[in-house]
């Protein structure tokens, strides 16, 4: 299952004078690693690119500068209570970051909603994707325009520009994103809606910051540990999200809750980290569902995918687990159902089973949700579904095994977001994983290396999870179905 570190505050890196010619010959090429904790290779970039610190583990040569540069520590453009794991080049900008703020006594930046706050509540009934437009992720759009397109020409550049316009979910994968990208995006949506957007825009986001996150893998470990007060920190993170949702109650907001977390509770309880995290995961998921149960909010719990929970041995226990969470949270009206195939590659409705899915009878996402739905209903959770089709365009993929989740070869952008799913329990096809952001590094010496990213069916060389992966974006674009 793909692992992710996405959507943190926009940060900038300063540039130093070019080193001598002899050093320049050994500098990294564009997109290569140029620094980070434990890195022993070149710490400068060839002419035409800049070494930008992405997080403490990884710096990357990004296009933009016309001189050779050396890795520099980023400096935040905003006052926050937490440092960002995913700073970006100063060439990446998004209007979502530039929002009016005030400072609390704790020093955290807090958005002041323009125009005096909400004048109404964006309540709804039934399918929350009906009657609204999904908001295109401005951060992802900026990545495509500033990182992808400069390396492309002709039809590929034109197609890439079209990708940037497709709505995709924005990830709150660090505490710092809540009072920056999240609140800023809500401010942008409010401005667009007040300017007459018809139908109005809805915000689409992923809540993804559990302590001891990603308990069964290494590629996208989170910022908090359960042993170091992580539960209290997570509750404060959820409380901040709630604060902004209340401030922007005039905006319908759709949330996917904690990819991978509960699915790991079904299949990976043999992993010590998952055993230790299980009770906390459940407690904090229930807390999030209760706190975010607001009339303008719709929530979908992440439920893995057909190749994870769709197996006959897993699907029954999964239904019991999700129904239990639903009941423990008090059957929140804003919990609409489950999200499937997040950051994965499965097709929706296939005529035949890919070889790597055998012998699972639920070899695509449609079969999975149709098998899952009656079990959930019988357990007391009448769930609806959304499915991530962002990387499902090419079927079969180049995966050698179904569980090979990292930067899989032979994949393409898939069906565009729509409510025309042909299935009453399926609310929408959506793009949850922004295509082109890496699943995990192939560098075996990296602190967050996961062995799945070194398999023969994983595209290499790959940067750290969440960093821009130009070769992967081009693969998705080339194999897009329907094409751009």
UniProtKB/Swiss-Prot annotation:
Q: Where is this region: Substrate binding loop 2?
A: 431-469
Q: Where does the UniProt entry place glycosylation sites? A: 175
Which residue spans traverse the membrane?
none
Where in the cell does this protein reside? Secreted
Region Disordered: start-end pairs = 68-98
Q: What class of enzyme is it?
A: hydrolase
Q: Which GO terms describe its cellular component?
A: extracellular region
Disulfide-bonded cysteine pairs: these are 34-51, 45-61
List GO molecular-function terms, semicolon-separated.
Answer: cellulose 1,4-beta-cellobiosidase activity; cellulose binding
**Pfam families in UniProt:** CBM_1, Glyco_hydro_6
**SMART domains membership:** fCBD
Q: How does activity depend on temperature?
A: Optimum temperature is 55 degrees Celsius.
**Subunit text:** Monomer.
Q: Which family does it belong to?
A: Belongs to the glycosyl hydrolase 6 (cellulase B) family.
Name by which UniProt lists this protein: 1,4-beta-D-glucan cellobiohydrolase CEL6A
Which organism is this protein's natural source?
Podospora anserina (strain S / ATCC MYA-4624 / DSM 980 / FGSC 10383)
Name the gene.
Answer: CEL6A
